[in-house]
Amino acid sequence: MSKLTEYTRYADAQQHADSRALWDLFDGDRERLNIAHECILRHATSDGRTAVRIAHADGADETLSFDTIAAGSARFAHWLEQSGIEPGDRIAFMLEPSLPFYLSLFGAMLRGAISVPLFTLFGLDGLRLRVDDCKPKLLITNREKAGIAEQLEGVRVIIADAGFENLIPKHLVYY
């Protein structure tokens, strides 16, 4: 049987679609599946292939490779582990799409934590409501939103600006 991704016509894919065959597309299985591995790590082949293109509001474009995201996510996962974050803990992040956003998202997943992305336009009340609901161990945000985030009780706030990567450079680039 061919893999679903081998069909080039929609009609063929529809005809041969089978939910059981979808598992053939993943490295993991029903018992062990890590979304960070499936989305990023298995595509990091040291060839610099583009994973994400970000169009910023100021007109600048940013390109992130699978290799960059994989290495940074692994370092961040190690940092989370050394910081006492356990599988199942929640990590909230209120960031625009950027390298820190993707490192937070996939690094938390790689660690086995639950990634909780938050809308960047939340004010104090909206943010408090979400944080009180999900009880994250960490809230990662930018300097602009740090003042709001630091008013919340019971959550450690990490500022993900240009120095964000300085938290994680000493850690291994695989997890």
What residue ranges belong to the model's regions?
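N-lobe entry segment of adenylate-forming
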Residues: 1-64, 68-81
